[in-house]
């Protein structure tokens, strides 16, 4: 693992990278660290900034980080007015799949996604053929029967091939039946049900209130013992609908 990576939530360090923790299990541990960068140009401004930030981690208290953002071979300093035009150029030159916007919050990610769809891709419908969607919650339901997919993972990207039928409104949510393909899994096509409301929430997926309502209403519809109800919910297409964001 990378020693500069964030540790698990609520922990000071990652136990998986701790020699002391592993020795506590009775293991004999050797440790080493790779420091030479092999897959980035030596004069890269990205590498220079990353190395500077990595070196700061050694100090306590941590100094205020500073980035050197002079335009160069791999950094171009843009004004906000130039962002959409530059992003459109990137899409045309490198493709949408090879162009990524990094932003500081889920709320701003939603704003960027809507701006891209409306002002670069000129898509007005909530969901359109060709839309790239990002799965925001692991799902084992819809991949069943497809040998190319063990499960649909949080972070998987899929492309809308076609919509099937009308939007359905149930449990306080809106559902759509779509055929999608997975570029990272040999473009395998599968039919899925997705929750449209999750596309534009300012949270990574559905809000807590939306999840609780979906769970309680689907649970109440089932019959039998508590265990039988839970078992039935595992096969319920609406309860197992994919939660996705624009990618």
Short names for language-model regions:
Residues 5-153, 159-161, 165-221:
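Conserved helicase motor core of P-loop NTPases
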């Amino acid at each position: 693992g990378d020693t500069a990576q964030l540790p698990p939530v609520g922990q000071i360090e990652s136990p998986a990278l701790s020699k002391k923790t592993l020795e506590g299990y009775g293991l004999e541990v050797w440790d080493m660290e790779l420091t030479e960068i092999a897959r980035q140009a030596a004069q890269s401004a990205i590498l220079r900034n990353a190395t500077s930030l990595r070196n700061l981690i050694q100090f306590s208290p941590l100094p205020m980080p500073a980035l050197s953002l002079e335009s160069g071979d791999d950094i171009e300093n843009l004004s906000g007015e130039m962002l959409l035009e530059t992003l459109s150029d990137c899409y045309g030159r490198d493709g949408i799949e090879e162009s990524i916007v990094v932003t500081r919050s889920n709320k701003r990610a939603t704003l960027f996604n809507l701006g891209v769809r409306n002002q670069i891709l000129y898509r007005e419908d909530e969901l359109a053929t060709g839309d790239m969607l990002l799965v925001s919650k692991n799902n084992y339901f819809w991949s069943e029967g497809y040998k190319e997919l063990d499960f649909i993972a949080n972070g998987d990207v899929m492309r809308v091939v076609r919509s099937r039928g009308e939007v359905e409104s149930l449990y306080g949510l809106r559902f759509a039946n779509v055929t999608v393909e997975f570029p990272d899994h040999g473009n395998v096509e599968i039919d899925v049900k997705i929750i449209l409301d999750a596309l534009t929430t300012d949270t990574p997926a559905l809000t807590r209130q939306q999840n609780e309502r979906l769970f309680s209403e689907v649970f109440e519809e089932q019959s039998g013992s508590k265990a039988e109800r839970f078992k039935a919910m595992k096969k319920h297409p609406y309860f197992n609908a994919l939660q996705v964001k624009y990618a």
